[in-house]
């Protein structure tokens, strides 16, 4: 006999273990001094649109509409005399069109069928593109300022590690769970059907193919390029004011300085406190008229003094000691999201794994709730061709009726009942932070006051010391002063408050890849999972090649009569036979039976794609966002209404400024103010003089870590302690077993995009502080005692993979989601394999012809059917006698279209014939397109603590002491 079919494909061997990975780069050098703050980066690119939601299952088919009333049949024509064929009668007029039936109600959804036998595992698709790089983390709060250390020399780049040798062949892992069956691709073009071949002899079964050789281990992919760093986040809100410095010792009287040029008119200050009743002083010379200040509280009547002589201005006193640094300000808002990093180089294609063992049949799940009417699904696959019935006796040829017109499309049925509300799913992983809004513009500066009138008068005598005024706004920090000499070692200071945790160190160098672990024992079989939701019906595959015809089966008993079929198209007119002998003209005969059903015509071409469906309903609003961080302290309220204007008194001489008072305790935090509207942009004020830097304080010892207490009320901000000593690295934990991959959840509805909040108002710039002398460096403190154990250390390197866990149960099917927007057409899938050709059964006897029912509404166009099989050639009939030519009769009136009788009952199925010869194996399908980029993965573990960074720049100087 001929050669048997090819054996099944061998199981691919297990993949080889990848070699160890070399270092991507050398060790990181010491951290350099912090650079100047960068400008805000441009807005990040808009996120990619989410993939469209899954298509809902098609709704149940509505009940068939009530058929319309049949049209009035045409007039019955007289039968012509038999003779030569008369002229063909015209078709009768069509009956009135029936009204469309009312749409039927949706049927209840049927129960889920038993789970089918799993098919062969498909080839793995090409690896998808690398996931987008996650957003950069938020900028941490700045640590306490310290002296600037010298920048260390840059480290040498480490040598690239040599490529490791390939590891030994790993043991075969336990078989994985059954993969989710992929959706079939769209149908390919139908090939032309070949002629039917002669039935071949039964082939011998082919020998089983040898197992395929194990695949070669793929080379490790190159590490993806590091994405650009995100822009620097905006600076945090300013910290609270520091305590004022102690007043300095009064300086000795200096020489009179030269008279300075009059300065620009300052901004009107807030009203001062009420003054005490002044003593009677010497009468002063009338000075120039100054700018009227804000009305203060009215003081008691002072005695009129005599004018005194001009006093000599004293020398400038030394700067007071530096005040304690203020507490650290709240953590700044996270910076804008960085641009997505460049996609990494796609890794090498992995080795095809061995197919998993088929899982146990799942139990039938409970019927799901009735879903909403889905969009019309793709056309289903063509049904299996029925067995041919026994050819009936040919009936007399009827008059050809006019082909009917297609009925109009029925009215769409009402939407189905809304299913019950779905339960809230588990909260998904936190999404990446959205892009930060643009920074608000700075408000416009108010107009400057009008300049004073009059010439400057001589300096007056030194007045008595006034009440301390309110503390002015702290000026900008000045440049760092020269470092003073080291002082004598001081006594041990008191234990300081525990410092705030330092900034997170830079990420460490990734360690070498760990060795592949030994395969664990195979887990126990999982319990049968619940039946999953039925997938969307795939498109029709291309028709397979025609198989060899099978042996003719034996005739079986007649089957029951089938339902009345739809009216078929009129058959082709038969070839005229030879004329018979002329007979005598007989009486008009009865109406003939309708002709036999003609061969079905070729199916029409596939129609154009319909218009896209309507857009789905708008999703529910997204969840309420987290409460934002408290805003900065509100601006100072405006002054109260001015009192009644008194009579202008004589302008007094300007007294020396009093010393700064001690700062009072901070008041309780006020209520959160409402966000005001965006103010006009202010003009940039003049830059103040930079103050000199004071000496840095000695670092205190690290405090012990206390147990967390209950949240108390917000207290007054305290002074920050020195930076604590970094804790020891924690013990590396044992890596847990890797869980199996869960089934993908239904994508939730998209939330509404957040709106940008209004920009806060810009504060006024304070006056510049005076330049103080360089301070004396304090003595270095002693090393503190060892601190408490630090926070949990960063995770160690990746451990060996544990054994594969048992397969989890399939979760219950969720309610169908709302239909999404129409998706883009998918790619062309691989061509399916040819199916076996069905057997041709014997034809059953022809049943009686029944009445024709009323024509129902036209259904939707079905898929193109397979080309029918060529029937067996019938025996040639006996040549009849040549008849006499008859007299041509007059043409009869148009006859009414004959009604088609019901189809005969299908004959019984014959015995299964021997299998045909195996067809040629189909070509391997092309790899599927890469899937969409998955959602961002969970946040990675915290890296090891980096080296302690250099101390920050010195803080701003304290307020000046009294002269």
Curated annotation (Swiss-Prot):
The modification Phosphoserine is found at residues 82, 558. Forms the fibrils of tendon, ligaments and bones. In bones, the fibrils are mineralized with calcium hydroxyapatite. Residues 40-54, 864-878 have a biased composition (Basic and acidic residues). It comes from the Eukaryota. Keywords: Calcium, Collagen, Extracellular matrix, Hydroxylation, Phosphoprotein, Repeat, Secreted. Prolines at the third position of the tripeptide repeating unit (G-X-Y) are hydroxylated in some or all of the chains. GO terms for cellular component: collagen trimer; extracellular matrix; extracellular space. The keyword Magnesium does not apply. Its main location: secreted. The keyword Secreted applies. Residues 296-305 have a biased composition (Gly residues). Residues 144-156, 611-623, 767-777, 813-828, 948-963 have a biased composition (Pro residues). Residues 90-106, 129-142, 190-229, 313-337, 349-375, 384-403, 482-495, 555-569, 582-609, 638-654, 683-692, 702-726, 849-863, 897-930 have a biased composition (Low complexity). It is found in: Secreted; Secreted, Extracellular space; Secreted, Extracellular space, Extracellular matrix. Residues 1-963 are annotated as: Disordered. Trimers of one alpha 2(I) and two alpha 1(I) chains. Belongs to the fibrillar collagen family. This is Collagen alpha-1(I) chain.
């Amino acid at each position: 006999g001929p050669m048997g079919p090819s054996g099944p494909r061998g199981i691919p061997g297990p993949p080889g273990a990848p070699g160890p990975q070399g270092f991507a780069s050398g060790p990181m050098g010491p951290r350099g001094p912090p650079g100047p703050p960068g400008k805000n980066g441009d807005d990040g690119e808009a996120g990619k649109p989410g993939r469209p939601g899954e298509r809902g299952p098609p709704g149940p088919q509505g009940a068939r509409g009530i058929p319309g009333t049949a049209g009035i049949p045409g007039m019955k024509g007289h039968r012509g005399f038999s003779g030569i064929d008369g002229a063909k009668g015209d078709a009768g007029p069509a009956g009135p069109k029936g009204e469309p039936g009312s749409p039927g109600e949706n049927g209840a959804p049927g129960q889920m069928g038993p789970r089918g036998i799993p098919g062969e595992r498909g080839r793995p698709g090409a690896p998808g593109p690398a996931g987008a790089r996650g957003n950069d983390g938020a900028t941490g709060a700045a640590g306490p300022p310290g002296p600037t250390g010298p920048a260390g020399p840059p480290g040498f780049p480490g040598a690239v590690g040599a490529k490791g040798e390939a590891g030994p062949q790993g043991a075969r892992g336990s078989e994985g769970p059954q993969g989710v069956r992929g959706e079939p691709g769209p149908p390919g073009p139908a090939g032309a059907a070949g002629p039917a071949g002669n039935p071949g002899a039964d082939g011998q079964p082919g020998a089983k193919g040898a197992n395929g050789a194990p695949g070669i281990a793929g080379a490790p992919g190159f590490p993806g390029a590091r994405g650009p760093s995100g822009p620097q986040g905006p600076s945090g809100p300013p910290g609270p004011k520091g305590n004022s410095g102690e007043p300095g010792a009064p300086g000795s009287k200096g020489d009179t300085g030269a008279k300075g040029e009059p300065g620009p008119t300052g901004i009107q200050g807030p009203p001062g406190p009420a003054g005490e009743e002044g003593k009677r002083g010497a009468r002063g010379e009338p000075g120039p008229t100054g700018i009227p200040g804000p009305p203060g509280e009215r003081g008691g009547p002072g005695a009129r003094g005599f004018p005194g002589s001009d006093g000599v201005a004293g020398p400038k006193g030394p700067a007071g000691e530096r005040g304690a640094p203020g507490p650290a300000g709240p953590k700044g808002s996270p910076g804008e999201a960085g641009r997505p990093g460049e996609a990494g180089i796609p890794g090498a294609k992995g080795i095809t794994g061995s197919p998993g063992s088929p899982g146990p049949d799942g139990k039938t799940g409970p019927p799901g709730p009735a879903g909403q009417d889905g969009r019309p699904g793709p056309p289903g696959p063509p049904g299996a061709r029925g067995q041919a019935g026994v050819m009936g006796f040919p009936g007399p040829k009827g008059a050809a009726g006019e082909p009917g017109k297609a009925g109009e499309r029925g009215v769409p049925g009402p939407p189905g009942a809304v299913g019950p509300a779905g339960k809230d799913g588990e909260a998904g992983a936190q999404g990446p932070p959205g892009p930060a809004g643009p920074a608000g513009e700075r408000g416009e500066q108010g107009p400057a006051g009008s300049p004073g009138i009059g010439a400057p008068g001589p300096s007056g005598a030194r007045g008595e010391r006034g009440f301390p005024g309110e503390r002015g706004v702290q000026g900008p920090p000045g440049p760092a002063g020269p470092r003073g000499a080291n002082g004598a070692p001081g006594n041990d200071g008191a234990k300081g408050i525990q410092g705030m945790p330092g900034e997170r160190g830079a990420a460490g160098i990734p360690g070498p890849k760990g060795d592949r672990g030994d395969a664990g024992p195979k887990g126990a079989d999982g319990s049968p999972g619940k039946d999953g939701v039925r997938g969307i019906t795939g498109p029709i595959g291309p028709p397979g090649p025609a198989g060899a015809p099978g042996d003719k089966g034996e005739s079986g008993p007649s089957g029951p009569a089938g339902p009345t079929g739809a009216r078929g198209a009129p058959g082709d007119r038969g070839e005229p036979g030879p004329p018979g002998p002329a007979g005598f003209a007989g009486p008009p005969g009865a109406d003939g039976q309708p002709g036999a059903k003609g061969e079905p015509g070729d199916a029409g071409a596939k129609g154009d794609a319909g218009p896209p469906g309507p857009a789905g309903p708008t999703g529910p609003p997204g969840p309420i966002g987290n409460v934002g961080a408290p805003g900065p302290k509100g601006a100072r309220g405006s002054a109260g209404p001015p009192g009644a204007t008194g009579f202008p008194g004589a302008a007094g001489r300007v007294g020396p400024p009093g010393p700064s008072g001690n700062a009072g305790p901070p008041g309780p935090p006020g209520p959160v103010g409402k966000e005001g509207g965006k103010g006009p942009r202010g003009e940039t004020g003049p830059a103040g003089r930079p103050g000199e830097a004071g000496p840095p304080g000695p670092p205190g010892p690290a405090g012990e870590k206390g147990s967390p207490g209950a949240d108390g009320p917000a207290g007054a901000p305290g002074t920050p302690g020195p930076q604590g000593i970094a804790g020891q690295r924690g013990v590396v934990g044992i890596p847990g077993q890797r869980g199996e991959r869960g089934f993908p959840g239904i994508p939730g509805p998209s939330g509404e995009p957040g709106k940008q909040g209004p920009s806060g108002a810009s504060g006024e710039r304070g006056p510049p502080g005076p330049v103080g002398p360089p301070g004396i460096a304090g003595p270095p403190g002693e090393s503190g005692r060892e601190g408490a154990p630090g926070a949990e250390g960063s995770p160690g390197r990746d451990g060996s993979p544990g054994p594969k866990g048992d397969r989890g149960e399939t979760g219950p099917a969720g309610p169908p989601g709302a239909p999404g927007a129409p998706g883009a057409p998918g790619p062309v899938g691989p061509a399916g394999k040819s199916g076996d050709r069905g057997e041709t059964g014997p034809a059953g006897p022809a049943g009686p012809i029944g009445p024709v029912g009323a024509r129902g509404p036209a259904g939707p166009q079905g898929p193109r059917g397979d080309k029918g099989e060529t029937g067996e050639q019938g025996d040639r009939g006996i040549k009849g006698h040549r008849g006499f030519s008859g007299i041509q009769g007059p043409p009869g009136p148009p006859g009414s279209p004959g009604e088609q009788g019901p189809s005969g009952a299908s004959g019984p199925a014959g015995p299964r014939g021997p299998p045909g010869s195996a067809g040629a194996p189909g070509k391997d399908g092309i790899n599927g397109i890469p899937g969409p980029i998955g959602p961002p993965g969970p946040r990675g573990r915290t890296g090891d603590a980096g080296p302690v960074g250099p101390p920050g720049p010195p803080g701003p100087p304290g307020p000046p002491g009294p002269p």
